[in-house]
């Protein structure tokens, strides 16, 4: 193998790695310096629920573990007092 072929192969491999690398999602609550998630903030909670009414997982939302736990509790509490539906008709 010549030096030119080696450089081309290395460049192609580096480009392939850049394409496959996913960008790390940042927790929206940490970015906004929100300490506690309020169950009465229905507009914010709706962003983390699917159209079927399920809570979106952490790998999709990008939340940290602490805020994902708080978010889940807030959504469940909002459902109990009928601010959010359990299911969508």
From Swiss-Prot:
Alphabetical UniProt keywords: Ribonucleoprotein, Ribosomal protein, RNA-binding, rRNA-binding
Molecular function in Gene Ontology: small ribosomal subunit rRNA binding; structural constituent of ribosome
Domain of life: Bacteria
GO CC annotations, alphabetized: cytosolic small ribosomal subunit
Residues that span the membrane, as ranges: none
GO biological process: translation
Pfam families associated with the record: Ribosomal_S18
Ranges where the record places region Disordered: 1-22
Skewed-composition ranges (Low complexity): 1-15
Family assignment from sequence similarity: Belongs to the bacterial ribosomal protein bS18 family.
SUBUNIT field: Part of the 30S ribosomal subunit. Forms a tight heterodimer with protein bS6.
Function text: Binds as a heterodimer with protein bS6 to the central domain of the 16S rRNA, where it helps stabilize the platform of the 30S subunit.
Full protein name: Small ribosomal subunit protein bS18
Lineage, highest ranks first: Bacteria, Bacillati, Bacillota, Clostridia, Thermoanaerobacterales
Gene (name only): rpsR
